[in-house]
Amino acid sequence: ISHNMETVKRITPLVRSAARYETSLEVIRQIADSGITAKSGIMVGLGETPEEVEELMDDLRRAGCQILTIGQYLQPSHKHYPVAEYVTPAQFASYKETGLAKGFDQVESAPLVRSSYHAEKQVQFYKKETK
């Protein structure tokens, strides 16, 4: 089951006014504690630092999250939160490497990744694990 964190702790109140960072972590924790594979996704390019992304990864791992997707935030319209930066492919690769080193089973990290990116591959991974 996926519950997207969307962004790092500092930026959450700016882009998710109806959601709290800690509440989202608790949702992930409850999913994982139920024995269900927990997945989350975040957008980068909102002004976060790599250190904040790593802190978010640590929080997700402590909550039991096993799959992480990381994609570039794209401003849907001029009324929405602006893009602070376009993250480089090298930084996306670094996020993937860091996430795997932190213990995520799977990390998809690239500019056009969305939370459903390669979902069929993720399902197949866990089907193999349960046989």
Cite the ranges covered by each PLM segment.
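Auxiliary Fe-S-binding modules of radical SAM enzymes
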Residues: 25-37, 44-131
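Core AdoMet radical
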Residues: 1-27, 39-43, 67-69
